[in-house]
């Protein structure tokens, strides 16, 4: 587990006005932290900045002891479940779950072992050969969650994980 620290974080798309201003938060290892607010207030943008998918235009983001503002997403050692699930339609459930492991060059045996474990945990064992279009919304959501869990990252960001 790693500490996540947002120090005076701001976000501007036009360099004139901030859509997120001066956020200061420390999330300790093992802590369960929830962002709550009305639609359009910047919750998803904040998660995307932590993940490295959106530029931080002000302040400092630390993961562990390391400042990560300019670190690419692949180097941040975290996983993310997206609001829209972000599944690859041409891949099977099994391939979607394993995608990040394949990119990280995890052995086939280890990928398969982790996939079986997480599929059992989330009730997806019977769906591993199906494509996302063959699944209900709740099943797709569980595939996205499985893909995040299977990576065993110390930090997991979830954008509206219970929306379905």
Sequence positions of predicted segments:
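ABC family nucleotide-binding domain
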Residues: 1-164
């Amino acid at each position: 587990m790693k500490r996540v620290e947002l120090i005076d974080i701001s976000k501007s798309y036009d360099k004139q006005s901030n859509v997120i201003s001066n956020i200061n938060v420390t999330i300790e290892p093992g802590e369960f932290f929830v962002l709550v607010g009305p639609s359009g207030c910047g919750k998803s943008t904040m998660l995307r900045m932590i993940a490295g998918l959106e530029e931080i235009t002000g302040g400092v983001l630390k993961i562990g002891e390391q400042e990560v503002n300019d670190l690419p997403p692949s180097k941040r050692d975290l996983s993310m479940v997206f609001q829209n699930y972000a599944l690859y339609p041409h891949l099977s459930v099994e391939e979607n779950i394993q995608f990040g492991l394949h990119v990280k060059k995890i052995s086939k045996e280890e990928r398969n072992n982790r996939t079986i474990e997480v599929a059992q945990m989330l009730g997806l064992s019977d769906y591993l050969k199906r494509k996302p279009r063959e699944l209900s919304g709740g099943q797709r959501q569980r595939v996205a969650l499985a893909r995040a869990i299977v990576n065993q990252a110390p930090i997991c960001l979830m954008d509206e994980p219970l929306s379905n």
